[in-house]
Each structure stands twice: as C-alpha cells, then as structure tokens.
Amino acid sequence: MGKLELLQCLTGHRGRAWGAGWHPKGNVLATCGEDKTIRIWAEDASQRWVAKTVLSDGHSRTIRDVAWSPCGQYLASASFDATVAIWDKKSGEFECNATLEGHENEVKSVSWSKSGSLLATCSRDKSVWVWEVAQEDEYECAAVLNTHTQDVKKVEWHPHEDILASASYDNTIKLYKEDLADSDWSSFDTLVSHESTVWSISFDGSGNRLASCSDDQTVKIWQEYKPGNEFGVSCPDNTPVWKCVCTLAGYHSRSVYDISWCKQSGLLATACGDDMVRIFKEVEGSSPHEPTFEMVGSKHAHSQDVNTVEWNPTVVGLLVTTSDDGDVKLWKYEPEE
C-alpha cells in the first residue's frame, strides 16, 4: 500500500467545508462552505498554505462548489441561494462581476468547458443549464436541460470535447452535446447501473472513461465505445455509447460523495461518508474493457463526512479534501516503492 501523508490542515471555514477547486496552475486553491464564504489559499515564502483572501459578499446562503476557468482568470461559485457568481481579479482584487440567475433553488455544482467558452450548472430543481460566455462579464443561457427526474448533484465537462456529463439523485448519469446544425443541446446517453444517488463523476485524462461514485457505496468505471469499434458494441444512430466495465464494491462502508481521476498518474481518489479517503490504481496489464482496480491507499481523513476530494492538476500526488468537520486538508500520496 502507498502512503497518504497529511501535509497541512487549513482552518478558517465555520460549519461544513463543501467545495474545493485548484487553479489550473496548481498554485492557488479556492474552498467554500456553509459560512457563505470562499477562501483563496496560496503558499507563503515558507511553503505553508495561507488564506490570501476571503470572499464573503457574493452569496446569501451556503456555497456548495467552486471552479476556476481553464485560463485561470475567473472563479465560479455555486450556492444554495440559487445563483452562480463569477469572480475575477481584473481590478487587482477579487470582485464578483457577474451573477447567473435562473435556477429555482440550490445550485449544487459548476464546471467550465475545456475552451472556457461554456459553463455548466446544475440544481435541486432537476435541471442542468449550459451558459455561453458571450463577452467580458456577460453570460447567456444556451440551454436548459430537464432530462433528470430528481435533484442533479454534479456536472463535469469532458477534458477535450464539448461533451457534458451530469449525475443525479435519480441514480443515473446523463451525457449531453450540442447539435451543431441547429445549436440545440440534448442528452445522447443515459448511464444506468447505480442503485442509488450518483453523487459525483470524473473523466480520466483521455476523456474515453468516466468514473462515478454513489450512495450505493460503489464506484463504477464507464468506457466510451465509438461507432465501428472493434469490440462489437453497437452504436445506434452512429452515436458513441458508454458502458459500465468495472464496479468497485466492498471498499466503502458509507455513501461515496466524491471522486477524482488524476489526469497525470491515472489514480482514482474517493471521498466517503465513513470519514475516509481511498486511493485506487488500475492493475497493470488489465484490459481497458474489463479493467481491474486495486486499493493502494486509505486514510481516516476527517472526523466527519468527507465531501470533496481533488487531485492537484500540476503536482503529482497532491490532493485536497473538505469535510463536514469544517477542515480543508492537503495530502501527499506516495506510491509503494
């Protein structure tokens, strides 16, 4: 087994710590929580992470999620007040320069597309919204997708294409894309296998695979099959299909709330209601179409539910967790020699 070492505990949030988002360069971290604030952390001269800024005037209720744009210039925050705020530092200090309104109640997740020209949000109102970045500080709704039958927990863009995935309380994952002929967004696949709420999803670096985690205490790996694939998987309407190729069961004793697929190492990290963080590695030589994963690390990480886990995009082995206990923790994973 590898080693998960606690590097630092970042304190300051009051109440639950919910979301965490690494800046694309990996040198800045944004976190948010029940205290209606966003904290921006960076390393000081002694390489300790410190809170550089606290943003407290953007939302009137819990902030559930934060995400940096791919260019690193903008930070989006999703709140239970039904809005999404867009922050930037153009003036030298962080300011909220746009507020996206339209959801009927709590916004649970926000995600930027790879190009940075699209933003996705999802809510307890069962809808997924796609927003176009029209011009500076202007965002236009490009689509309202009402395909889920329950609360939508998570949205995540494909790492290379304008394909969007969403996870829901209705136990399914939906995939969406735009019909370029008529600019209409629609769902082209529904991934069904989980037996309870799907809390979170994460694409691998290639975008050909998706990991999901659920209230059913499992993690599932989904593989994309394109039309004309050599595995004989049929693709109706000449559209790629996604199939569950692996289920990780028996590792988690409570709901699995978040999952992060490291784009550099290929390692999976999970955040669980049993207060644990676990690391999984694909077994070398296993078939991508029937992969096997093994647990290569685990840690009792917090004193309450772990809400978020996210690998740093540039520093291999560095990850952040947030918890109901109010703490944000930084960890270093060292594989077994």
Curated annotation (Swiss-Prot):
Keywords: Repeat, WD repeat. It comes from the Eukaryota. Pfam families: WD40. GO terms for cellular component: cytosolic [4Fe-4S] assembly targeting complex. The keyword Repeat applies. CDD domains: WD40. The keyword Repeat applies. WD repeats lie at residues 12-51, 58-97, 102-141, 147-186, 193-232, 251-290, 301-337. One of its GO terms (biological process) is iron-sulfur cluster assembly. Belongs to the WD repeat CIA1 family. Essential component of the cytosolic iron-sulfur (Fe/S) protein assembly machinery. Required for the maturation of extramitochondrial Fe/S proteins. This is Probable cytosolic iron-sulfur protein assembly protein Ciao1. It comes from Aedes aegypti. The gene is Ciao1.
